[in-house]
Amino acid sequence: MANKTILFNKHLESNAKMVDFHGWDMPLNYGSQIEEHNAVRQDAGMFDVSHMTVVDVIGNDACAFLRKLLANDVAKLKVPGKALYGGMLDENAGVIDDLITYYLTDTNYRVVVNSATREKDLAWIAKQSQGFDVTVTERPELAMIAVQGPNAKAKAAAVLSAEQNAAIEGMKPFFGKQAGSLFIATTGYTGEAGYEIIVPENEAEAMWQALLDQGVKPCGLGARDTLRLEAGMNLYGLDMDETINPLAANMGWTIAWEPSDRDFIGRKALETLRDAGTDKLVGLVMEEKGVLRHDMPVFFTDSAGVEHQGVITSGTFSPTLGYSIAMARVPNSIGDTAEVEMRKKRVAVRVVAPNFVRNGKQAF
């Protein structure tokens, strides 16, 4: 029996096509994935992300514990509400999950982890917390709605109270703030401005309906995937997992090497990998017909004339650009052109940074 979010009936009311997503009944689309995608790029769309897992880490050792648990360094967070993206690694530097951590106080942090990795993550966090003065509490009574797009903030403002709007006025990107019963964050998975709103389950349906009434378009997993891929954002399980280190997943920027005496889990293995050199994650663009897909092989010849092979981790048709884009893991000697094998023939592709669309515009 699949899990259902508190918004399940609201999805059915909007004629959602429901699919199983890692044990959750979730909307794939509400009729047109392309229309949903374009709504987020041009206006405002919303996603039920209540299947995500909210975990509060509280206690005298909260900071010290998270500095060991995560490859990024929560000690960088000095302003209440500031958020940090990064990886939680195992001892071999494989990525257990990627997650966002919010700094609330020196003894209180909020962590949001993926739904597909929930049980594994919670078990790992509990195991690693032994010996630290911390309490790790999952918050299943909280739902989450992401409102994204150039008009998302204005439309969300119409459903928030005057006090809530005052609390979040001028909030910079990658911050979160408790505003009444809501935790409102300027984060997202689309490359657009907007909010991710953590809302008590008993208020979630009313908030969803209020956003619908403001003309915010409900969007499913299909649009969520094309939007995040255009934005060059990783999907756990495709672009990285426990067999992949963050340097090979375009996550090098999330690793806090300094201070050098911070012994985060996986550090020694990661230093060895860094010094030896790893594969890297790049973007691919194919302007001729066809769609780049997960697991297609990528070939290129280096400056010495040696052929190398990599693989597409995520690929799709980009509605914003009008052609296919992909992310691929390849040896780091790649230049700015390559070939992808499709239907038993090789097709030329351009190699770009894995970031295709930002704020509705081409980003490469």
Swiss-Prot record:
Reaction equation(s) it catalyzes: N(6)-[(R)-S(8)-aminomethyldihydrolipoyl]-L-lysyl-[protein] + (6S)-5,6,7,8-tetrahydrofolate = N(6)-[(R)-dihydrolipoyl]-L-lysyl-[protein] + (6R)-5,10-methylene-5,6,7,8-tetrahydrofolate + NH4(+)
UniProt keyword annotations, A-Z: Aminotransferase, Transferase
GO cellular component: cytosol; glycine cleavage complex
SUPFAM superfamilies: Aminomethyltransferase beta-barrel domain, Folate-binding domain
Gene Ontology process terms (BP): glycine decarboxylation via glycine cleavage system
UniProt xrefs under InterPro entries: GCS_T, GCS_T_bac, GCST_C, GCV_T_N, GcvT/YgfZ/DmdA, GcvT/YgfZ_C, TrmE/GcvT_dom1
Superkingdom in the source lineage: Bacteria
Keyword Protease: no
Family, similarity comment: Belongs to the GcvT family.
Protein name: Aminomethyltransferase
